[in-house]
């Protein structure tokens, strides 16, 4: 995380950084990792305030602990929150309400921008409704989990050289892009 901040310092504010609490936290050290994220977000190293955080899966007990630690600890300097492993727009709306409630409790008046990872067929089926949510600013395609969710129907090569050429992958990316353009959001992968 420090290397990314250093690179951003050298290159300027030309890219965002996402601190990963889901895959970045060592097992058993999830709270310590979230605390480190807060420390870095509030440090002078966060020059441009273009650092967001990817929290744990909403079904994980660490989702709530991430929110409970990071929003009060560094919410004013947080560029966005990325929510992974969602299944539908109603779930995303409920998670946003939970985030907003914690922000209000923490004295944060701004609405934190939300990035949503589209990683499953369920979320892809509801991608237009997810994109329509006002606080959602970006939909990001989670290629690895999406391919894994097909249990071999998409070959493992779709995670390497051919990652964007398989028809199911192209279809998913197209749906995400169309939903984003329809509602003025940013598509990413």
Residue locations for each model-derived region?
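Expand to "…catalyze enediolate/carbanion chemistry for C-C bond making/breaking, isomerization
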Residues: 1-189
């Amino acid at each position: 995380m420090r290397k990314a901040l250093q690179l951003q310092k050298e290159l300027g504010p030309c890219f965002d950084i996402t601190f990963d609490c889901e895959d970045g936290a060592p097992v058993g050290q999830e709270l310590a990792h979230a605390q480190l994220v807060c420390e870095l977000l509030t440090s002078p190293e966060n020059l441009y305030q273009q650092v967001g955080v990817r929290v744990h899966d909403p079904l994980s007990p660490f989702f709530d602990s991430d929110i409970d630690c990071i929003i009060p600890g560094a919410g004013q300097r947080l560029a966005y929150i990325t929510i992974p492993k969602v299944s539908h727009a109603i779930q995303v709306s409920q998670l946003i309400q939970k985030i907003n409630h914690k922000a209000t409790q923490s004295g944060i008046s701004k609405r934190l921008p939300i990035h949503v990872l589209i990683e499953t067929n369920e979320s892809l089926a509801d991608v237009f409704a997810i994109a329509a949510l006002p606080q959602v600013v970006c939909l990001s395609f989670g290629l690895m989990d999406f391919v894994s969710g097909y249990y071999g129907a998409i070959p493992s090569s779709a995670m390497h050289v051919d990652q964007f050429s398989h028809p199911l992958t192209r279809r998913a990316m197209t749906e995400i892009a169309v939903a984003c353009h329809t509602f003025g959001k940013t598509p990413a992968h």
